[in-house]
Amino acid sequence: MDLLLLEKTLLGLFLAAVVAIVVSKLRGKRFKLPPGPLPVPIFGNWLQVGDDLNHRNLTQLAKRFGDIFLLRMGQRNLVVVSSPDLAKEVLHTQGVEFGSRTRNVVFDIFTGEGQDMVFTVYGEHWRKMRRIMTVPFFTNKVVQQYRHGWEAEAAAVVDDVRKNPDAAVSGLVIRRRLQLMMYNNMYRIMFDRRFESEEDPLFQRLKALNGERSRLAQSFEYNYGDFIPILRPFLKGYLKICKEVKETRLKLFKDYFVDERKNIGSTKSTNNEGLKCAIDHILDAEKKGEINEDNVLYIVENINVAAIETTLWSIEWGIAELVNHPEIQQKVRDEIDRVLGVGHQVTEPDIQKLPYLQAVVKETLRLRMAIPLLVPHMNLHDAKLGGYDIPAESKILVNAWWLANNPAHWKKPEEFRPERFFEEESHVEANGNDFRYLPFGVGRRSCPGIILALPILGITLGRLVQNFELLPPPGQSQIDTSEKGGQFSLHILKHSTVVAKPRSF
């Protein structure tokens, strides 16, 4: 059976080579394509650049080929944009033309081939899903409704760290407790639910399944089969695991959370007065026939990945930078004590009074961008960009990390220096008002979660710094900030141990 598969694959490679050469010649005459390394038949540039298309590797290619370049990865065209002007073209000026999402063999599994909001193609389904999700998740009213819960969760983290006898001596991996906090923050909004402890069996199952989903989706291991369809049979085992994880996750979401809200029956109100949490609004849209049950479950899938994990990564990066820059940590602490008073715990409304804390959040998102390439875009039809022809269904990556770390545009960008947002970059905000700084993207497909992420980051980092002196573990002068990149993610490689010495008030 393996021999037969090999023979079919080799025959397919030969036929694909012939087709690729013919198509390449025809396209070369038709299109003025962006520059890039010379592709070879079938494989394109895959053998030259490999699977690991992280932001730093793509930055090196941009230095060689320019602010826009093309990689032919098997049968897929991948266009990388690395300048503010071109980013503006993709995300704003031609936001409709480049407003779709690329397909991918693994993401197709986890999103039901685009039945969600984040990864669906641009069109009526996306507009409907965005509208349905905005009211229960992404408004100032939601922030005001749930900010007391976020403050309570941050207070619980502080209490648990204080009670931990190891925290002030040998340290603890604080990410584990912060992960529970983030699940509770979002599950309060989604389901009016929270988990009492890290040992909760349901939380353990949920965390494990979401972690496996992220690992499978963000891995570069499957690129060869995605780029080169005739090699896809070799992905059979990988894709089988993806399908099993997807089915198990969706069943868990349905059985333990969605069905519970249906049973509570709070969506029976015709004037929406009985709607208590986000999923009630989503289920109300299902009852009206606007979406189906699968759409409901894929919305839950989006929030589990896009809201929980990315914010957690940013909190972890912020803690790491504060530990490694004690003078900055002390400035945050001094500001909180001076403005709010010693012992007054940071609340969401207080953040506006704490500009240095806000600058620390912005600098964390600049230097350690959780989604450094943003979520990939796609043009459904042939398009123009930077004077070049972009073939239909090209994958467009905006290297947002390089936009925010290019020394041609930023002063000493490699330094963690929040002061830049008081000095030369005082006008720059995280909402995309400057195309050099796009931690949440901008335009039609920007991340609506910015309205939740910024206050949660401010509350969490503020509470930790005002209650503890955060230090590296004994024997270390700093904690390791090596990066772990994914398909379009960036998180810390090692979940660091942090010493948290309580302050006395």
Swiss-Prot record:
The lineage of its organism: Eukaryota, Viridiplantae, Streptophyta, Embryophyta, Tracheophyta. PANTHER family: TRANS-CINNAMATE 4-MONOOXYGENASE (PTHR47948:SF11). One of its GO terms (molecular function) is heme binding. This is Trans-cinnamate 4-monooxygenase. It is a single-pass membrane protein. Catalyzes the first oxidative step of the phenylpropanoid pathway in higher plants by transforming trans-cinnamate into p-coumarate. The compounds formed by this pathway are essential components for lignification, pollination, and defense against ultraviolet light, predators and pathogens. SUPFAM superfamilies: Cytochrome P450. It comes from Vigna radiata var. radiata. It comes from the Eukaryota.
